[in-house]
Amino acid sequence: MNFLLSKLLLGLIRFYQYCISPLIPPRCRYTPTCSQYAVEAVKKYGAFKGGRLAIKRIARCHPLGGHGHDPVP
């Protein structure tokens, strides 16, 4: 089940990266970008923990939040 959810999440993230992201200006304050971080987190930890890490990272990515290099733990 986790495998299928991981594949679904990765597909949605890749769709965003290739179809939506090129249409909007870059604004991620971190490296790797939030979408790449999400891919790495889901691949490393699976859909549930990786998805939770990705959501927490996206929530931190705003002008008053942090910035810089923030790899997947």
Swiss-Prot record:
One of its GO terms (cellular component) is plasma membrane. It holds the Pfam family YidD. It is a peripheral membrane protein. Signal peptide: none annotated. InterPro entries: Membr_insert_effic_factor_YidD. Keywords: Cell inner membrane, Cell membrane, Membrane. Its main location: membrane. It is found in: Cell inner membrane. It comes from the Bacteria. The keyword Translocase does not apply. HAMAP family: UPF0161_YidD. Could be involved in insertion of integral membrane proteins into the membrane. Belongs to the UPF0161 family. This is Putative membrane protein insertion efficiency factor. It comes from Neisseria meningitidis serogroup C / serotype 2a (strain ATCC 700532 / DSM 15464 / FAM18).
